[in-house]
């Protein structure tokens, strides 16, 4: 099945929404750096990698006592498997927040298996045409046990049908890909779906004290907060009611139907 890549319905600019000051984890000394990616440390067992091809596409290395998870693989990072092996000696499990070129680019070919949300399976032939490894499907609500550390899988459709957020309840943060926090939201589904996703995430953040969601394009100060998730609910409801209307721009719309700010 051929799927139109970037079948975007709307672009929600979220940069002006209320959010508290945040510590940047990109200011310290890099633990790894080359021309394609830079890794900085978030805490003792968590790192963020910043690619340089598509708006600072971000990948995250999350380590437990038994294994580590690599969340996303960037656009095109040569020898990514060898790079992460210089940071952790634990076996690596590759998971994807969603199947788009800047998150499941050519570096996925270096890994024997990848875990994705089945909602994005139709994107695989176009986005990962040369991947020969095993593609395994995540289950909503499952826990990935890394040994002394767990990530809960939360399906968060909106940016894509198979967008996924990974929540570390004990650390009080998560990793949301482009579902939340990337400075804007490219929405490929309807606003009712987005509202349901945001309401679910808001409840999770409230119940478990989740302070931040690290996004798929991290600039140091744009980790998503509960307040901004709630703001997205309000904005989406205003769009549905007609209180807020999108507009077409005269410049290049990059395939977008409307811009909503």
Regions found by a protein language model. Name each.
Residues 76-146, 238-241:
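Active-site HxH/HxHxD metal-binding segment of metal-dependent hydrolases
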Residues 42-48, 141, 150-152:
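Short, hydrophobic/aromatic-rich segments at coil-to-beta transitions
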Residues 68-70, 76, 150-157, 161-238:
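Metallo-beta-lactamase
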Residues 33-86, 165-178:
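Conserved beta-strand hairpin/beta-sheet module of binuclear metal-dependent hydrolase folds
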Residues 247-261:
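C-terminal regulatory/interaction regions
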Residues 1-22:
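Bacterial Sec-dependent N-terminal signal peptides
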Residues 47, 93-95, 115, 136, ...:
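Hydrophobic/aromatic beta-strand patches that form the interior of the parallel beta-sheet core
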């Amino acid at each position: 099945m051929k799927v139109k890549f970037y079948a975007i319905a709307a672009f929600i600019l979220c940069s002006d929404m209320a959010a508290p000051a945040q510590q940047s984890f990109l200011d310290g000394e890099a633990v790894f750096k080359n021309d394609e990616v830079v890794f900085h440390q978030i805490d003792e067992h968590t790192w963020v990698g910043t690619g340089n091809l598509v708006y600072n596409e971000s990948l995250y290395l999350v380590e437990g006592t038994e294994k580590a998870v690599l969340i996303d693989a960037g656009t095109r990072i040569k020898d990514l498997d060898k790079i992460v092996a210089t940071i952790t000696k634990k076996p690596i499990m590759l998971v994807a927040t969603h199947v788009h070129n800047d998150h499941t680019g050519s570096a996925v070919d270096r890994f024997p298996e990848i875990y994705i949300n089945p909602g994005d399976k139709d994107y695989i032939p176009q986005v990962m045409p040369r991947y020969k490894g095993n593609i395994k499907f995540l289950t909503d609500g499952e826990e990935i046990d890394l040994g002394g550390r767990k990530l809960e899988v939360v399906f968060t459709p909106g940016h894509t049908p198979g967008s996924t957020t990974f929540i570390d309840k004990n650390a009080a943060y998560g990793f949301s890909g482009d579902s939340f926090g990337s400075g804007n939201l490219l929405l490929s589904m309807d606003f009712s779906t987005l509202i349901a996703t945001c309401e679910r995430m808001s409840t999770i953040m409230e119940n478990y004290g989740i302070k931040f969601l690290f996004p798929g394009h991290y600039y140091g100060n744009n980790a998503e907060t509960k307040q901004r998730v709630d703001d997205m609910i309000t904005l989406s409801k205003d769009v549905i009611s007609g209180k807020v209307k999108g507009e077409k721009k005269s410049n290049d719309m990059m395939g977008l139907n409307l811009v909503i700010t």
